[in-house]
A protein has these predicted regions:
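Conserved catalytic SET/PR domain of SAM-dependent protein methyltransferases, capturing the structural core
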Residues: 1-167
Length: 167
């Protein structure tokens, strides 16, 4: 049983030093849903008790809640970070193309759109001109990132950003 969904217009395959990634097989139009995340909802304490490989295949969906994928990696798990992503979040569980994506392009999103915890800090390999080099759970606080990804953040981060800017 698959817990995640990846569009038939893409496939998961090796992505160099990033491990695996998902790549467009056909043109994908801006606004198309490309992936859906599913699995088990766990709190931070439970997530911390899980094996590291399971932690890396999770997505933060609320203040202290994480969606953890199944035991076996699935194509929908193979979505990498980029500091110049072509996809963004719709709500907390759907990934949507932010722009048209050509065949062969890797589907990516900026983990700042969903992660606000330090459980998954890592060195970035995206190689884009605006690469932050290190991705952390506090990146969403950067006003430039907030402006760049307005409308593409997870629902709970939208609430956090609104609370910050209200003061």
């Amino acid at each position: 049983m698959d817990y995640n969904w990846l569009t038939v217009k893409a496939e998961a395959r090796p992505a160099g030093e990033k491990g695996f990634g998902s790549f467009a097989l056909q043109p994908i139009r801006a606004g198309e849903t490309v992936a859906g995340f599913g699995g088990w909802v766990v709190d931070r304490v439970t997530l911390a008790e899980m094996p590291v490989y399971r932690q890396h295949r999770s997505i933060q969906i609320d203040e202290d809640l994480y969606l953890v994928s199944g035991e076996t990696p699935e194509p929908g798990d193979m979505l990498n970070h980029s500091c110049e992503p072509n996809c963004g979040l719709l709500g907390s569980q759907l990934l949507v193309a932010r722009r048209d994506i050509a065949p062969g392009e890797e589907l990516t999103f900026d983990y700042a759109m969903c992660d606000a915890s330090d459980y998954d800090e890592f060195r970035c390999f995206c190689g884009t001109p605006t690469c932050r080099e290190v991705v952390s759970g506090s990146d969403w606080r950067d006003p430039a990132i907030q402006a760049r990804y307005a409308g593409w953040f997870s629902s709970y981060l939208v609430r956090r950003i609104a609370a910050l800017t209200a003061h």
